[in-house]
Amino acid sequence: MKDIYQMAAEFRTTILKARTNREFSGDGLIERFPSGNCGVACDLLGRYLLEQAGVRSWYTSGVIGSESHVWLTLENGDIVDITGDQYKNQSGSLYYDLPVYVGRMDAFHSKFRLNSNPVEITPNDWTPDFLGEDRMQRKKRIAYETILKYIG
């Protein structure tokens, strides 16, 4: 089985390849990845880790001033972030240029004050209920299926 870092890096690279091929143009969801896409990226990566490796993860969000950010927290306490480099043009304490981070809470992530309890990513997040698939579930499903087409 691939390690978590390798899976996260491959997932990110795949999103970038699909974006380069304009797969997400006009989707209003992940077309600007990684900028402004930390939440959606976590939803999709969390699903991928669960389905492909049985790895449980929690959607973790925090704020610092007017900035917000989302990353995954794993059962062992490690965090996974594939969008941190969206802060590479920031200055001071918000500067961060790692495209993929897997490990213990680092200085950058610890600056964010959690604004809610982490929420586990489960199949219920992408399984339509008795009313059917809602608009956001549909967008995420299409993005996820597109990403999977690019994973070798």
Regions found by a protein language model. Give the residues of each.
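A structural boundary/capping signal
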Residues: 1-152
